[in-house]
Design a protein with these regions (language model features):
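Extracytoplasmic beta-strand/coil segments of soluble accessory domains associated
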Residues: 54, 77-109
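Face-selective signature of the C-terminal outer-membrane beta-barrel domain
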Residues: 229-257, 280-423, 446, 450-451, ...
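Short, acidic, small-residue-rich periplasmic hinge/interaction motif at the N-terminus
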Residues: 28-69, 89-90, 98, 130-131
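N-terminal periplasmic accessory domains that precede
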Residues: 44, 76-79, 113-114, 129, ...
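Outer-membrane beta-barrel signature, preferentially recognizing the C-terminal barrel domain
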Residues: 386-389, 429-432, 460-514, 532-545, ...
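Short acidic/polar hinge/loop motifs at secondary-structure boundaries
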Residues: 82, 108-134
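Outer membrane beta-barrel strand-and-loop segments of large Gram-negative receptors
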Residues: 342-346, 393, 488, 505-565, ...
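Transmembrane beta-strands of outer-membrane beta-barrel pores
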Residues: 163-169, 183, 194-198, 252-256, ...
Length: 706
């Protein structure tokens, strides 16, 4: 670890030395013989960058990337961290107040994040952030990020490879190869991906129960994880004419993960120790997934027609062996096998209408998930359960332009038939039929130099299939985890306000949620010594207000581009805790301060800071966390690009803390996992062309649930 600290500090010093050297060169005018040309190019970029890069339209915030400093930033996820209302948390993209978005690239839905990770900034034309999706999208989708790439032409073979090497406690690496062959109107494409890594983490749990006496269970755990990912994708796209195109692809991925853990537990009753236990746990997890996606897009007169379909199969196998030592050794094993499948299709049509358009469509999804668990020498019983769902949705909407005013109004009707089987027999108490109408409406208007968008939507959150399973998972001697087949969907009413004025972007959202799904802490059996974590529907409604302001002044001093965003999430919620009403309404404050430095000789440096305060989310108290990341990138040629980065240089994001309050119990969880890492990314491309695949995909949210 000391050697890693030394390497990180040395790497940070090198980056700052290069930044300082480039600033000195820029200020003194000592560069190369082409300095005048570089200055002219830089001056042109400055002129374009001083214009607002983000504008607001009827969908959401649209940010121009082509021809701006953002196209030199590196990769798509680096660009997203600079967008208003978007957070980049160590590669995990979130829309503020909306959670993880659904990605679209050139109209087709992204099902593998490798595609987003491979996308380079200079391939992007624009990015649209939608915080209140229209009726066309499933009621469970809270936000969308749509990426439009620069249209490229040219036939022949293209090759694009990205290799990543890094150190985070241990060395890790991944490689992604993108191949494409284009001839006339036919595209044949394929991707291959491989990842391998090793990491360590630790956790500490303190469980408190206030019954006739005070019980406390203390648990510490250290784990080492080995992971791999092998991914392949092959497909084609054919455009017989400008009015007709179709295509399909097949994708397969295999992800084996092995985790070894050592656990120390102790039980206290009124501060008097009753027992101590040590345990060793080995988990082997293997995921195999197959996906077939296809689309057809056509124009018939003034009608725009689209059809998409998806077929997915997934198998998960988990073997868990535990050795507990409590004076005598107890060895037991748990085997869990899961099978999931999905069939989804969407039909969509739109037509010009009055001063806008009119559109309608139908979504159909049929999915199932079956889980079989076997327990050997354990008090946890084996389970066999199956969930089968049929989802049929109809939607219609219209968008009209009236001078400086644009309004969109629509509705979506969803019919869901959910059937729950235990041991092959249908359980009617846990089977449900839902029929619900979800309206959406938005109004956009220009007031002077200010663009304002006000929208309303009704949304739904359906439990993940794993949250509905009654299978019990072993965490440690005093803590188990399971799903809850009695969970109901939660529904929310959302009012959103987006505002854009010159260099200021403001996003605000208020929502009220009924049947909020929260984490509960109960007991596994009548002995009340083993806690059980599971999800349940809250009896109290939850209201939530989110506001974020982003300041983007453009270029300063011709080489510096800052983006400062400050946001607050405040919930209004109360729970029953230890016989009293507890208000969990401490706000969460989020700050991001991203900085781009552009220099001569194709150098680009970034210094990014992010921080989240302590506060409440649902019935959980979250601790504060923050980090600083540095990077330096250079285009060596038109084919080669190198990027060096140091993440979490002060190791401040290593620890995350949570406290869950539930009934007469609470549990404090402290997780420590290394985020700090040094990384080198090397990219080589040859005759790159972007695939013309236009499939939008169907049933994305249902796949996430599976």
């Amino acid at each position: 670890m000391k050697m890693l600290d030394f390497k990180v500090k040395r790497f940070v010093g090198i980056i700052f030395h290069l930044i300082l050297a480039q600033i000195c060169l820029a200020q003194t005018g000592i560069a190369n013989q082409n300095f005048g040309k570089d200055t002219l190019q830089l001056r042109e970029v400055v002129v374009r960058a001083t214009r607002p890069l983000a504008k607001l339209n009827s969908e959401g915030f649209v940010t121009e990337v082509k021809g701006t400093v953002l196209e030199k930033l590196g990769f798509a996820k680096d660009v997203m961290g600079m967008l208003p209302g978007v957070l980049n948390n160590n590669g995990s993209i979130e829309v503020f107040g909306k959670g993880k978005p659904v990605f679209y690239i050139n109209g087709h839905i992204v099902r593998n994040n490798i595609e987003v990770e491979q996308l380079k900034a200079n391939q992007i034309d624009k990015i649209t952030v939608i915080t209140n999706p229209s009726s066309r999208y499933a009621s469970t989708i809270g936000s969308i990020i749509k990426i439009t790439t620069i249209k490229k032409v040219g036939d022949g073979f293209s090759f694009d490879n990205i290799a990543t090497f890094g150190c985070r406690n241990y060395m890790y690496g991944k490689d992604n190869l993108d191949l494409n062959y284009r001839i006339d109107n036919l595209d044949v494409f394929g991707t291959l991906g491989f990842e391998k890594g090793k990491n360590t983490n630790s956790s500490k749990n303190v469980q408190n129960s206030w019954l006739s006496s005070h019980h406390q269970q203390n648990t510490t755990m250290k784990s080492t994880q080995h992971s791999k990912l092998i991914d392949g994708k092959w497909g084609f796209d054919f455009s017989s004419s400008p009015k007709l195109s179709f295509g399909a692809f097949y994708q397969v991925s295999y992800a084996p993960i092995k985790t070894n853990s050592s656990i120390m537990s102790s039980l206290y009753s009124d501060d008097v120790i009753e027992s101590e236990t040590s345990a060793y746990k080995d988990i082997k997890l293997r995921d195999l997934e197959h996906l077939l996606d296809g689309y057809c897009h056509g124009v018939w007169g003034k009608w725009n027609l689209e059809m998409t379909f998806d077929l997915m199969w997934k198998k998960t196998r988990e073997n868990q062996n535990v050795i507990e030592q409590t004076g005598i050794n107890q060895d037991f094993g748990i085997k869990d096998v899961g099978h999931a499948r999905l069939m989804a299709t969407e039909l969509y049509a739109s037509h010009p209408f009055l001063k806008g358009n009119f559109s309608f469509g139908v979504d159909f999804t049929n999915s199932s998930r079956e889980e079989n668990s076997e327990s050997e020498n354990s008090i946890m019983a084996g389970e066999n359960n199956k969930i089968q769902e049929l989802n049929l949705a109809y939607y219609v909407e219209t968008m009209q332009h009236l001078g400086n005013v644009t309004f969109r109004i629509g509705g979506r009707y969803e019919h869901v038939n959910s059937e729950y089987f235990i041991g092959g027999r249908k359980n009617h108490e846990q089977s449900h039929v839902y029929d619900k109408f979800f309206p959406t409406a938005s109004l956009s208007l220009l007031i002077g130099k200010t663009m304002v968008q006000l929208s309303y939507s009704k949304q739904c959150y359906r439990p993940l299939y794993s949250q509905l399973s009654n299978t019990v998972h072993y965490v440690n001697k005093y803590l188990y985890q399971s799903g809850n087949p009695y969970l109901q969907p939660s529904y929310s009413d959302n009012i959103s306000l987006n505002l854009r004025y010159r260099w200021l972007a403001l996003t605000a959202n208020y929502k009220k949620v009924q049947n909020q799904i929260i984490t509960s802490y109960t007991y596994y059996d009548d002995s009340k010594t083993i806690a059980l974590l599971k999800k349940e529907n809250s009896r109290n409604s939850l209201s939530n207000l989110q506001i974020m302001a982003s300041f983007m002044p453009g270029f300063l001093w011709k080489c510096y581009y800052p983006v400062l965003a400050c946001g607050v999430v405040s919930q209004f919620y109360k729970i029953d805790y230890r016989g009293n009403i507890k208000h969990v309404d401490n706000p969460l404050v989020v700050v991001k301060f991203n900085n781009i430095f552009k220099f001569h000789n194709n150098y680009m440096a970034t210094v990014n800071y992010s921080w989240r305060s302590a506060g409440n989310s649902e019935n959980i108290k979250m601790g504060s966390v923050g980090q600083i990341n540095l990077s330096l990138a250079k285009d060596l040629s038109k084919k080669w690009n190198v990027k060096l980065s140091a993440n979490d240089i002060f190791n401040t994001a290593r620890k995350n803390t949570f406290t869950i309050f539930s009934g007469m119990n609470d549990v404090y969880i402290e997780k420590a996992a290394s985020v700090r890492a040094v990384e080198c990314i090397v990219r080589y491309k040859f005759n790159t062309v972007k695939t013309k695949y236009k499939g939008k995909g169907a049933g994305k949210k249902e796949m996430d649930r599976l």
